[in-house]
Amino acid sequence: MSRFFTTGSDSESESSLSGEELVTKPVGGNYGKQPLLLSEDEEDTKRVVRSAKDKRFEELTNLIRTIRNAMKIRDVTKCLEEFELLGKAYGKAKSIVDKEGVPRFYIRILADLEDYLNELWEDKEGKKKMNKNNAKALSTLRQKIRKYNRDFESHITSYKQNPEQSADEDAEKNEEDSEGSSDEDEDEDGVSAATFLKKKSEAPSGESRKFLKKMDDEDEDSEDSEDDEDWDTGSTSSDSDSEEEEGKQTALASRFLKKAPTTDEDKKAAEKKREDKAKKKHDRKSKRLDEEEEEDNEGGEWERVRGGVPLVKEKPKMFAKGTEITHAVVIKKLNEILQARGKKGTDRAAQIELLQLLVQIAAENNLGEGVIVKIKFNIIASLYDYNPNLATYMKPEMWGKCLDCINELMDILFANPNIFVGENILEESENLHNADQPLRVRGCILTLVERMDEEFTKIMQNTDPHSQEYVEHLKDEAQVCAIIERVQRYLEEKGTTEEVCRIYLLRILHTYYKFDYKAHQRQLTPPEGSSKSEQDQAENEGEDSAVLMERLCKYIYAKDRTDRIRTCAILCHIYHHALHSRWYQARDLMLMSHLQDNIQHADPPVQILYNRTMVQLGICAFRQGLTKDAHNALLDIQSSGRAKELLGQGLLLRSLQERNQEQEKVERRRQVPFHLHINLELLECVYLVSAMLLEIPYMAAHESDARRRMISKQFHHQLRVGERQPLLGPPESMREHVVAASKAMKMGDWKTCHSFIINEKMNGKVWDLFPEADKVRTMLVRKIQEESLRTYLFTYSSVYDSISMETLSDMFELDLPTVHSIISKMIINEELMASLDQPTQTVVMHRTEPTAQQNLALQLAEKLGSLVENNERVFDHKQGTYGGYFRDQKDGYRKNEGYMRRGGYRQQQSQTAY
Amino acid sequence: MASRKEGTGSTATSSSSTAGAAGKGKGKGGSGDSAVKQVQIDGLVVLKIIKHYQEEGQGTEVVQGVLLGLVVEDRLEITNCFPFPQHTEDDADFDEVQYQMEMMRSLRHVNIDHLHVGWYQSTYYGSFVTRALLDSQFSYQHAIEESVVLIYDPIKTAQGSLSLKAYRLTPKLMEVCKEKDFSPEALKKANITFEYMFEEVPIVIKNSHLINVLMWELEKKSAVADKHELLSLASSNHLGKNLQLLMDRVDEMSQDIVKYNTYMRNTSKQQQQKHQQENMQRQSRGEPPLPEEDLSKLFKPPQPPARMDSLLIAGQINTYCQNIKEFTAQNLGKLFMAQALQEYNN
């Protein structure tokens, strides 16, 4: 029966393909009608197929079956559940039962269940073994069934007296039931089959489908094949399937219950099976069609075309033959397609193809660029929509298509300067074909490009960075950049300042992390020939990225009104400066921006960018030999121990438990693609080496000072780890190298230190990663020499009365002026108690270092000071008065504290020296 | 022959080790109500203690032993002693009481005084004011009222003067310990400070006349060089060690005070808060505010830190300070002497 309706609707939908009808017909017009009819129809089939009695009884038998199964596997909990359902179902079937009498099988299950439960109940051993739930269920079920069975006592006793008979009866009854139902089924099937056949013959003859006639066979084929597909995937028709299955089950159940089928019945059953199958197939088909129908009604008729896509490709069948393709028609069509967008069950891939088809048609019919632009916008939007999930990324082919499409769009836009594109153009005010006026199209090229950029990031995030695939994807980066550049050029002409800012930022984001090798090369080779040739060269090679960054960022600084873009631009600018070793510019910009004060209010991606910038800044400072600055810049990132996370270069396993799935997804989305990564080992090495250069002399200078503070906790941690090693082999990892170097430096042995810091292994791991590796290495050697000299002087000054600077300069392979300047500096800073003897070029030590006892006494005094302070605090508390007398005294005490400092001590000592 | 010698002592005179009894009892040390006013130690005991340390004690490790003797009038005579075996990890189940009883029984068989009158302990730079010492001395004194603890300082002895001191707990401290309440209030009530924890009992070393004669003779024969260790001017090591130890104790003291401070703050804060909260609640219910007493029942105040430890630390610091004072005074004396000598020679 359903066949009939399907056919009808089928032909109708087919007819709507003709287009003319559709144009005149309001889209929403037939929206609710047919599905409504259909649903009624569906219900009808069920109601007609089985009588109410059958239906109820089938329900009951089904439940009984599950109960029996549960009984078999001793799942009492399940039994209980099902029993409750059974009771309900029985209640529903009450009216029928009243008419027909209590069904035998019902009595039987009740009796059996009770017996079964009693048996279980008696089986103490088994009960013990049962799990808690089951045991509980058992007792409740037992009580329930006792209560319930009281109503059926007479039936049950009679059943128990004569179980055989009642079983037979039951079987008979079932047979009858199933016969009846199968008969009905048959009837119905007969009809449906007939209708189906009829439809087959009828459909092509429908006048609206004339144009499909030739393709009929093909069409059918495709439909069939699709049927198979549906069988496999079942995604679209899963609902119908499950329903179907239920029906099947009931039918089967009734059949299974047959005890002794006669041959006749056997045949019938076989026949029925076949029919069933056929019916099912038809049903499914009809279901699918129905669905399509629904979708058609929802979003234009195009879904129907899906079946004929290959066909359509060969011959555009978007519009009926002979239809005059006008703007109105095309736009109408477009709207229809777009309405399906975002709806469930819309085949997005097909939608895209359809749109592309539409472009083709529009192009073929010379509908003007406006329409094409419009459609293109929508194609790109659909491409973006293709993935329903935000986390998943575009497939490569989609991505390729998207890039092509944007390129084409840009081509058109460049070729036709009279097209205005904008977000703020309303649909109504669009002008797609009136050639007299400038064309106006709604849509924002900038948003598209931004989205494209996001998609690109997503693709990069989701590709294994060590695979060839990543490289392949990375090649698209050039294309992305090219597009951004084009859009930039376009927007520079037409866009508002805000838009320009946004596209500039995009450009910046694709520029800032790249090291400009060309510019670097140019810098390295000083102008040889005339300035003119150099200029030519520069022109040939295009703009320096530095100049480009400068230009873009300045524009943003000046014009941007949203804080975020400016912040990002500044950070990128700093990063770029730092990357190209323009330390002072980078630092000044960082300080001027005051970003350090308020970056914690920014959103996480900006914070990640900030962290990246700081790290780059630190590395830059290191390259310049500014160890202290490098250390300070890297301190925040390194001391947390979460550099990886802070730089957005990976998630920490440790905190994995702390966050839920949602957060993790969010964090994953924040990750920086691999090609932007900053080498973490390099980062750590730079940090540790700069910490070493600072810390080792400091440690040597304050060896006996109780108030000595650590400059770098992390460095100390590494040192301690190194010390804990029971057996010290030659260093393997970068950290071990640094630790070994630190130890050498502590002894003032700069040569060993040097060999630990700069060797083959470390070169490969770290130093070669710098663009100017050799320069860095020379800087590093010099730093090591200087700091070793300082350490040496701190550590061993007490054993020297005087030392010749020449000796020192030989020892550390530094030239005399450098040694002189280092020592002078130390003397000025009161780090070294010595004086320089100019004529002999020697350092004369002053024996003013406190002895061990003096040091101890100083420490003791300090400790006592704090003790007194603590004591006073207790006293304050007792008194309940903060401030007052003791407060004053405390301040006084603090004033005196100065004498404990080394400088003060020395002064005192020099006064009392004899 | 028991000579008393003050710490600031002219070192040159009391050179003989046996003669150098280290009874530096301060005036307040002897308490009037105790039966024992003086401790008389046999030379044998002193030698045994020294020998015990030399054979078994090393560095910071301490040696301990039992003192035997008897009380005669107001005098505690220590006539013999025996050492405790050193504790090692292996014999954790070693029964000390059993060992003591057996030792004493055996000694009785050879007619040696077997009255348990206390115990002795070696010390490392005078760091003996500890909880362990307090506890065991308390149990001794609890059982035998007269018992004392002899503290032997091997390092000082090595510098030329025997250092042996007898201590016992003051009656006040005994009472506090009996009650086992070391809360700040209890200590305040007992009016106990670190100065009145231990009292030193003056000691006298007694030898038989024959031995005394021998001593004189030995002294005559001994070369001058044997006595020179007393004149050593090297002071830094000892002083440094003492300072280090003192510093550690000061650190502990600081921590203790901080702990106490936090406790005080917490208590007052809690009291205020809880009081306010409770009263607010009561007010909202229209009840009169709670009286103070109920409050402490309602809310358990934070556990007050035991103050005994800080008392002990204070006592220890005091000892160190005494030590350092003594030592520096002696050394200054030596320095001046050396200077004078040099001037004289020149």
Curated annotation (Swiss-Prot), chain A:
Location comes to: Cytoplasm
Where Phosphoserine occurs, the residues are: 9, 11, 13, 15-16, 18, 39, 166, 178, 181-182, 910
Major subcellular site: cytoplasm
Its biological function? Answer: Component of the eukaryotic translation initiation factor 3 (eIF-3) complex, which is required for several steps in the initiation of protein synthesis. The eIF-3 complex associates with the 40S ribosome and facilitates the recruitment of eIF-1, eIF-1A, eIF-2:GTP:methionyl-tRNAi and eIF-5 to form the 43S pre-initiation complex (43S PIC). The eIF-3 complex stimulates mRNA recruitment to the 43S PIC and scanning of the mRNA for AUG recognition.
| PROSITE patterns attached to this UniProt entry | PCI (PS50250)
* Database matches in SUPFAM superfamilies: Winged helix' DNA-binding domain
Q: What is this protein called?
A: Eukaryotic translation initiation factor 3 subunit C-like protein
Modified sites of kind Phosphothreonine: 525
Query: Can you tell which superkingdom this protein's organism belongs to?
Result: Eukaryota
Composition bias, kind Low complexity: at what positions? 8-21
Q: Where is this region: Disordered?
A: 1-44, 157-302, 523-543, 886-914
Q: How this protein is processed and modified after translation, per its record?
A: Phosphorylated. Phosphorylation is enhanced upon serum stimulation.
- Residue ranges annotated as compositionally biased, kind Polar residues, are 523-532
Q: Which residues carry this modification: N6-acetyllysine?
A: 99, 644
Q: Which family does it belong to?
A: Belongs to the eIF-3 subunit C family.
| Domain PCI intervals | 674-850
**Annotated Gene Ontology cellular component terms:** eukaryotic 43S preinitiation complex; eukaryotic 48S preinitiation complex; eukaryotic translation initiation factor 3 complex
Give the Pfam families listed for this entry.
eIF-3c_N, PCI
- Alphabetized UniProt keyword annotations: Acetylation, Cytoplasm, Initiation factor, Phosphoprotein, Protein biosynthesis
* One term of GO molecular function: RNA binding
Q: Give the record's subunit note.
A: Component of the eukaryotic translation initiation factor 3 (eIF-3) complex, which is composed of 13 subunits: EIF3A, EIF3B, EIF3C, EIF3D, EIF3E, EIF3F, EIF3G, EIF3H, EIF3I, EIF3J, EIF3K, EIF3L and EIF3M. The eIF-3 complex appears to include 3 stable modules: module A is composed of EIF3A, EIF3B, EIF3G and EIF3I; module B is composed of EIF3F, EIF3H, and EIF3M; and module C is composed of EIF3C, EIF3D, EIF3E, EIF3K and EIF3L. EIF3C of module C binds EIF3B of module A and EIF3H of module B, thereby linking the three modules. EIF3J is a labile subunit that binds to the eIF-3 complex via EIF3B.
Give the signal peptide as a residue range, or say none if absent.
none
Biological process (GO), any one: translational initiation
Which intervals carry biased composition (Basic and acidic residues)? Answer: 199-216, 261-278, 887-900
- Compositionally biased, Acidic residues: which spans? 166-190, 217-232, 291-300
